[in-house]
Every structure is written in C-alpha cells, then in structure tokens.
Swiss-Prot record:
The UniProt record lists the keyword Secreted: yes
Range of residues in the leader sequence: 1-23
Main location: secreted
Record-given protein name: U1-theraphotoxin-Ct1b
Family classification: Belongs to the neurotoxin 12 (Hwtx-2) family. 03 (juruin) subfamily.
Amino acid sequence: MRTFTLIAILTCALLVIYHAAEAEELEAKDVIESKALATLDEERFECSLSCDIKKNGKPCKGSGEKKCSGGWRCKMNFCLKF
C-alpha cells in the first residue's frame, strides 16, 4: 500500500512538472499570454487553500463560499482542469 501511494504521488508530481514545462514553452512561443498563466496559478492557489476533499466521489467544495471554478476541480488539494 505504501509503495502504491508513493508511486501515485511521484506520478502526480511528474505530471505537474510536465504541465508547467509545456506551459512555459507555449508562453515562450507566444501561443499563450503570460497573464493567462498567472490567472491559472491564482485559481490553483485559491483552490488548494479552500478545497475540502470529500469521500465517496462527492464533488469538491471549498470552505465557505470559495469553490474551484471555470472547469477546475479539486483533487488532492490541487485544482485540476477537466
């Protein structure tokens, strides 16, 4: 069980690193604007602070009024785009 958890955490970390590298590459090619990346980072940060992960597949809701928005969902305290 510990091995599976470690593999899952490392896989998620690699996915985040890959996603960030691809976003920087697209920004360098002027495909996306740097303001768009800043907005995505702000949404992820807000979500990671306010996300309460629920069990049994229930949707993720933030503490109080904050929620992931704009197609973002909270998984493992991160906002992920679906």
